[in-house]
UniProtKB/Swiss-Prot annotation:
It is found in: Cytoplasm. GO terms for cellular component: cytosol. The keyword Hydrolase applies. Residues 1-19 form the signal peptide. This is Putative amidase C869.01. Gene3D superfamilies: Amidase signature (AS) domain. It catalyses: a monocarboxylic acid amide + H2O = a monocarboxylate + NH4(+). One of its GO terms (molecular function) is hydrolase activity, acting on carbon-nitrogen (but not peptide) bonds, in linear amides. The active site is at K141, S222, S246.
């Protein structure tokens, strides 16, 4: 299967008009002949600057530069006959060949991508335009099932060659909306479930993915390649998944927009699962508007994901989320809270000044910002950073995830064909059997320092939903929702004694304990790029709200984006970096 896909990919690249070097046969040319025919160049090679936006200039696309092109701009090119979807795919293929060998954001190309683009071009020529995503290329994290010539493996060799029964529901939705599936993105293997001490963005099948701003540092995860590929201009948008931070964190670290929806607003059906209580699917894009275009085609009830039934009566009556997009004038009179204790007080030293500067700009635009809108229960927020084992066993988020994962992965694998992997036990056995690649034991593979201790911890529970499990479910829900985000949003002004619900909580999304609270609650969050750290890596400002409050995140996320007009360009610092693990 892998060799077949390689040949398919090479065939598509040949069709793309790119020369494909062939391996020299040793039967016709000896090594000595090759050496003798070479001219020795004694000139010292001068390496290009490794910290510049000029290192990988975006290739021209029919004399147009698509760098940072939005969905609206791409549609404008196609509507006016300047570019076709096929042209745009060719251009992203050029960019893929230029930068992916360094940043490793895309795991696998779709061999049929040009065929799909051509079919959508034919539709456009015949007056059929499905919507704003018609002809727009995208990628999905390698834990979204795609029923095509690509493998869905969560980055693991254990599932290579397996056959999924169907497209994931949200992938099907995007295909029907006219989006062009370009490929699968790299990720942290098994979406960070397998190990507790690991190199973020690494998988056995995909290798180490890297942040295009600084290739030596942690690119965030587990939707690493999704964010990296958008930031590197290899694709228009991408899909990610999140159980705890896996959309917000990589989007923030790569200077793009990440929208994590309420659990149950977008389907998880056909996605390699972790926890039904916290898993969600969402877009990673260049702008809030682009993210909402994608989200608009993703959300909705899916009878195969019962959690999506919870959205009934809690979404816009007309089904339109695009109407909530706004500009900076919407900030006039808006009321935001700063949960200072634990969250803001743990903001990074090289981020806090810029974060507060942005808060001041928001105030100057007419918003009212209330400080110390804190959570009621602060004991569930670690001062030592992200920790899903915090608390006793009947209070821990990790208890819930470990039990859920054991059962959910078995259910998912029950429908996958052409594989001997049917359970968590099978995965653990595979990793032990192929130790040199999958690192089943600690300190065998540098990227998996703790081996597969996450899997072993889940295996130890065996999926048993006992009293301890249900106590943990209730505790996590109550402390993150009623005593957490909802408590902070329901504010009483000490000066006027007026009580009201805030329009959102502004948080430093670069602080892992912030997105962890939204993850535990199953509540929505958005992150916006606002600056870069001293090491050149981006960071962001987040907005959190209660369940089903995506309209608020869209309205004020787009308003703040319009106010700031901020965009950082990757400088590919140390673009030849090969360090593993990354920190």
């Amino acid at each position: 299967m892998k060799l077949q896909l390689l040949f398919l990919t090479l065939a598509q690249l040949a069709k793309h008009g790119l020369a494909i070097p062939l391996l020299q046969s040793s039967k016709t040319t000896t090594n000595s002949t090759l050496v003798a025919s070479q001219e020795v160049n004694f000139t010292t090679y001068v390496y290009p600057d490794t910290n510049s936006t000029n290192i990988f200039p975006m290739p021209k696309c029919q004399n147009i530069t698509l760098e940072d092109a939005t969905i609206d701009q791409l549609q404008n090119y196609m509507e006016n006959g300047i570019l076709t979807s096929t042209d745009i795919v060719h251009c992203y293929l050029d960019r893929y060949l230029q930068v992916n060998p360094y940043v490793n954001g895309i795991l696998q190309l779709n061999p049929d991508v040009l065929t799909i683009a051509s079919e959508l071009d034919d539709e456009r020529a015949n007056g059929i335009i499905r919507g704003p995503l018609h002809g727009i290329p995208f990628i999905v994290k390698d834990n979204f099932a795609t029923k095509d010539k690509m493998d869905t493996t969560a980055g693991s060799y254990a599932l290579l060659g397996s056959i999924v029964p169907r497209d994931a529901y949200v992938v099907k939705q995007l295909r029907e909306a006219g989006a062009v599936l370009f490929g699968h993105a790299t990720l942290s293997e098994w979406a960070d479930m397998r190990s507790n001490d690991y190199s973020e963005g690494y998988s056995a099948r995909g290798g180490q993915s890297r942040c295009p701003f600084n290739l030596t540092v942690n690119p965030g995860g587990s939707s690493s390649g999704s964010a990296i590929s958008v930031a590197s201009n290899m694709i228009a948008f991408a899909l990610g998944t999140e159980t705890d931070g896996s959309i917000i964190d990589p989007a923030m670290r790569n200077g793009v927009v990440g929208l994590k929806p309420t659990v149950g607003l977008t389907s998880r059906y056909g996605v390699i699962p972790e926890s039904e209580h916290q898993d969600t699917t969402g877009p990673i894009a260049r702008t809030v508007r682009d993210a909402v275009y994608v989200f608009q085609s993703m959300w909705g009830i899916d009878e195969n994901d019962i959690y999506t039934l919870n959205q009934t009566g809690k979404t816009p009556e007309d089904g339109d989320y695009m109407k909530f997009l706004s500009n900076k004038t919407s900030l006039e009179g808006a009321r935001f809270g700063l949960p200072w204790k634990r969250l803001w007080q743990n903001a990074k030293a090289d981020e806090i000044d810029r974060l507060l500067e942005v808060v001041k700009q928001i105030e100057e635009a007419g918003a009212i910002v209330y400080n110390n809108t804190n959570f009621y229960n602060l004991d569930v927020i670690s001062n030592d950073g992200w920790n899903w084992e915090l608390g006793s066993v009947n209070e821990s988020e990790y208890t819930v995830v470990k039990v859920d994962f054991y059962n959910n992965i078995k259910s998912y694998l029950s429908e996958v064909k052409n594989t001997e992997i049917h359970s968590l036990e099978d995965i653990v056995e595979y990793n032990n059997k192929y130790m040199g690649t999958e690192g089943g034991k600690p300190n065998i593979v540098p990227a998996f320092s703790s081996g597969q201790d996450g899997f072993l911890a889940s295996l130890e529970w065996g999926g048993v939903k006992n009293e301890t499990y249900w106590q943990a479910v209730e505790y996590v829900r109550r402390t993150s929702q009623d005593e957490g985000i909802d408590y902070a949003l329901n504010y009483t002004d000490p000066k006027t004694n007026d009580s009201f619900i805030l329009n959102g909580l502004l948080v430093p999304s670069g602080t892992s304990i912030t997105y962890q609270q939204a993850a535990k609650a199953g509540y929505p969050m958005i992150t916006l790029p606002i600056g870069v750290k001293t090491n050149g890596r981006p960071f962001g400002l987040g907005i959190m709200h209660s369940a089903w409050q995506e309209p608020q995140l869209i309205k004020y996320g787009s308003a703040i984006e319009d106010l700031l007009q901020y965009k950082a360009k990757p400088k590919f610092y140390e673009y030849v970096a090969k360090n593993v693990p990354v920190w």
